[in-house]
């Protein structure tokens, strides 16, 4: 899939490439948050995945969906449909509300070879491409003992503190309070960090090109200090979690195909392995400073 219009990236130490029939400069304009993750020179290590992107024109008519619908994510800003394609491999369709097609993805059985068409204006194309890359990363990085999380992370005294919780619980707010009141604290990522169990058995958290509405795209990693799952409550209380709840707390924020038994089992195994190496807490807290 390598051609002259190929960009190489490395996130959490793991390489992937994005190619296009458009120019490199046009592709880069759709990927401003990836600037610090770009690798100028190709390396010999095998990429997690290779993605080819076609930027659809106004006259391009998308083909109808084929195959068996496996799962649908319907969230406030986006709909994602996962298909098993008739000839093997995977298909994903991404829509923005109200059901406007933003991207079509076709991927090999192991997700390592993929082709995407992205539609709409430049903002929609950039959003769709980011979602395609995030999904491919989450689905292939598991084999390298890495999990893409929905969380907010601060760095304090050389360690990363990962705030988890349901949407609206206050993950970003909690990070901002640390930045405001605790010296020597910096934001590492505000929406989608990567946590990786390293070959030496340590657990590190990495900044990524994906940080939600907060432009925090930092290419750096630190050892994990703790995972903290937040709950709004009438009292302030922090509790150290024990297995198996500690591992379940991690996977509760991880991205992946939960409906696929084999994939979900591997997610569970990695989550429990990570939980053995670091502290996992629940923090019940008042909605104030």
Language-model-detected regions and their locations in the chain:
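A noncatalytic interaction/capping subdomain that flanks phosphate/NTP-handling catalytic cores
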Residues: 1-162, 167, 177-186, 194-289
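Hydrophobic positions on the alpha1 helix immediately C-terminal to the Walker A/P-loop
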Residues: 174
């Amino acid at each position: 899939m390598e051609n002259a219009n190929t960009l190489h990236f490395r996130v959490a130490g793991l390489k992937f490439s994005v190619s296009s029939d458009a120019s490199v400069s046009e592709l880069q304009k759709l990927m401003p948050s990836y600037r610090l993750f770009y690798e100028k020179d190709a390396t010999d290590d095998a990429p997690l995945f290779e993605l080819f992107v076609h930027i659809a024109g106004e006259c391009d008519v998308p083909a109808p969906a084929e195959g068996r619908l496996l799962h649908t994510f319907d969230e406030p800003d986006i709909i994602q449909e996962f298909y098993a394609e008739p000839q093997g491999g995977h298909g994903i369709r991404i829509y923005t509300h109200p059901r406007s097609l933003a991207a079509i993805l076709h991927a090999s059985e192991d997700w390592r070879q993929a082709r995407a068409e992205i539609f709409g204006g430049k903002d929609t194309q950039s959003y769709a491409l980011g979602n395609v890359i995030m999904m491919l990363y989450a689905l292939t990085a598991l084999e390298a003992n890495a999990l893409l999380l929905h969380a907010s992370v601060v760095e304090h005294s050389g360690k990363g503190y990962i705030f988890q919780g349901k949407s609206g619980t206050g993950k970003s707010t909690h990070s901002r309070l640390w930045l405001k009141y605790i010296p020597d604290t910096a934001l590492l990522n505000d929406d989608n960090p990567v946590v990786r169990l390293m070959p030496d058995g340590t657990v590190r958290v990495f900044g990524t090109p994906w940080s939600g509405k907060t432009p925090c795209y930092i290419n750096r990693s630190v050892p994990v200090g703790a995972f903290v799952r937040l709950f709004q409550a009438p009292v302030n209380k922090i509790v150290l979690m024990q297995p198996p709840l500690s591992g379940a707390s991690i996977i509760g924020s991880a991205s992946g195909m939960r409906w696929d038994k084999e994939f979900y089992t591997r997610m569970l195994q990695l989550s429990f392995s990570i939980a053995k190496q670091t502290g996992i807490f629940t923090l019940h807290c008042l909605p104030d400073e």
